[in-house]
Amino acid sequence: WITNPFEPHITNGRLYGRGASDMKTAISSFMVATEIFLEENKFAFDGTISFLITILRRRGEAEFGTKSLIKWIKSKKKKIDYCLVGEPTNPNRLGEMIKIGRRGSINFLLEVLGEQGHVAYPEKADNPIDNLEKIFKELHKPFDSGSKRFQPTKLIITSIDSSNFTSNIIPGKVEIRFNVRFNDKFNSQQVINLIKKRIKSVTTKYKLSSKVSGESFFNYSNILTDSLVRSIKTVTRCNPILSTTGGTSDARFISEICPVVEFGLVGKTMHKVNEMVEIRSINKLTKIYHQFIKNIFLKNEFNK
């Protein structure tokens, strides 16, 4: 780092620090935008603007943070009409992309079982590695060709491990870890069932465990999306792409209670050394959020 990552530092028109692009600055921009809006409309505003800000969001299996907050909102029967998440959705320039949905995600651990033995006597052992080629062929069969809103479901193998560090022992098992990113043609249980079916077509000697990170979701609210698109066009003159690509986000939890879209800064440096954002982008984002709030709450603005 050229600066202390935990102390914001401005140099050459850029703000450096951990979270500068993902996504602390977006929170600050929305707060300033809200302050400006309330000053302008303090006698005409009868809605509610809330900030959902959490900590420990990435600890464990996302049990804390947003997920817990959504449980609390449900328990209190609080009604939320719309939500905007300030994720850094833009690949290269501000105004380029809005996320209006996300693919679902499941992590799998497959243990293919065999019988350990000496390599000199393969007839007395059962090498689980021998089945891998057939298993991989089954797992990599296409799930679908995509949908109207999403790209095709995709399986990616991330590791293969027999825990065998010698060259003269046939392993008793081999572990394969893989992830499936699935579209709106499936729910998580359907994906799990299909994976089991494909493995069983090759072998019954296996164990399979899975962890669902989130279901796929899509925002069907025209008002929410249109309000944000108009705001971006007004400030940047860009016509944003409406996208469902990329990884999971906390919007997957929020989608359980209300329509949600995601828009923030450029994400080129997020999670990297010297994470930064241009000051002019922060100012533009604040203007976009300000216009978005007006579009949502002031009918005369939305109907322009």
Regions found by a protein language model. Give the residues of each.
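Activation loop
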Residues: 4, 11, 26, 104-106, ...
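Acidic/histidine-rich catalytic neighborhood of metal-dependent amide-processing enzymes
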Residues: 23-101
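Structural motif
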Residues: 13-14, 18, 50, 54, 81-83, 154, 243-245, ...
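Acidic/His- and Gly-rich active-site-bordering loop/insert found
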Residues: 1-18, 38-45
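Glycine/serine-rich anion-binding loops at beta->alpha junctions
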Residues: 14-29, 118
